[in-house]
From Swiss-Prot:
Involved in base excision repair of DNA damaged by oxidation or by mutagenic agents. Acts as a DNA glycosylase that recognizes and removes damaged bases. Has a preference for oxidized pyrimidines, such as thymine glycol, 5,6-dihydrouracil and 5,6-dihydrothymine. Acts on DNA bubble and 3'-fork structures, suggesting a role in replication-associated DNA repair. Has AP (apurinic/apyrimidinic) lyase activity and introduces nicks in the DNA strand. Cleaves the DNA backbone by beta-delta elimination to generate a single-strand break at the site of the removed base with both 3'- and 5'-phosphates. The gene is nei. GO terms for biological process: base-excision repair. It comes from Escherichia coli (strain K12). Changing residue 53 to A: Loss of DNA cleavage at sites containing oxidized pyrimidine. No effect on AP lyase activity. Its EC number is 3.2.2.-, 4.2.99.18. Changing residue 3 to D: Much reduced glycosylase activity. No effect on AP lyase activity. DNA binds at residues 70, 125, 169. Keywords: DNA damage, DNA repair, DNA-binding, Glycosidase, Hydrolase, Lyase, Metal-binding, Multifunctional enzyme, Zinc, Zinc-finger. This is Endonuclease 8. NCBIfam families: PRK10445.1 (NF007763).
Length: 263
């Protein structure tokens, strides 16, 4: 499943394609959304927001399209008139004079009023977004030590969108490798230095991934600015200590870690 950085980059691409441009055609696959098609013609997208792994497309008439890609949903940007060759099922089409955005395969799609936006079950449940520039390590530390989360093992906590929105499996393993911890630790057991390092890594690594993953620095031997240290690298030597990276399962998800420097 795409994680927060990937969802945010998708939102950036959608905004760049159609933000501020009048919609010339709107189509929804689901019957309950059909009445909104005519309401959106002539309106425009004001901005595209992310809340963790959910994407909110805001329109100039104050309606908001909520979508959660889950495992299979994917957005595409195409030139208007282009019909991509795909076996995926089209769910949403928002067309402007020159660009069209298409949502395929997603099933969790709703149209929300401003009032519904404040009471939506998923949006109420998610914690602060790791890509929100206003979220600080101090606030993250407070959440780590709160009665709700301090007794939770990191293996499960770092996948829980109620703790911090936008984290997922690759971020979970990369963050824990960065701070040298295994997934069975709890916040209540950390010393001050470990807690501080974790609070910073929980923000820095997702933000670095969002900003640089896929970009290349020709002065770096390995190329990409953001690259995995342990994720999908089982059987390879750890770049920090040389031990062999291992793979196991924690909280029903693949977990990659270094037994030499994660304790």
């Amino acid at each position: 499943m795409p994680e927060g950085p990937e969802i945010r980059r998708a939102a950036d691409n959608l905004e760049a394609a159609i933000k501020g441009k009048p919609l010339t055609d709107v189509w929804f696959a689901f019957p309950q959304l059909k009445p909104y098609q005519s309401q959106l013609i002539g309106q425009h997208v004001t901005h595209v927001e992310t809340r963790g792994k959910a994407l909110l497309t805001h329109f100039s008439n104050d309606l908001t399209l909520y979508s959660h890609n889950q495992l299979y949903g994917v957005w595409r940007v195409v030139d208007t008139g282009e019909e991509p060759q795909t076996t995926r099922v089209l769910r949403v089409k928002l067309q402007t004079a020159d660009k069209t955005i298409l949502l395929y395969s997603a099933s969790d799609i709703e149209m929300l009023t401003p009032e519904q936006l404040t009471t939506h079950p998923f949006l109420q449940r998610v914690g602060p977004d790791v890509l929100d520039p206003n979220l600080t390590p101090e606030v993250v530390k407070e959440r780590l030590l709160s009665p709700r989360f301090r007794n939770r093992q990191f293996a499960g906590l770092l996948l829980d969108q109620a703790f911090l929105a936008g984290l997922g499996n690759y971020l979970r393993v990369e963050i824990l490798w960065q701070v040298g911890l295994t997934g069975n630790h709890k916040a209540k057991d950390l010393n001050a230095a470990q807690l501080d390092a974790l609070a910073h890594a929980l923000l820095e690594i997702p933000r670095f991934s969002y900003a640089t993953r896929g970009q290349v620095d020709e002065n770096k031997h390995h190329g990409a600015l953001f690259r995995f240290k342990v994720f999908h690298r089982d059987g390879e030597p750890c770049e920090r200590c040389g031990s062999i990276i291992e793979k196991t399962t924690l909280s029903s998800r693949p977990f990659y870690w270094c037994p030499g420097c994660q304790h």
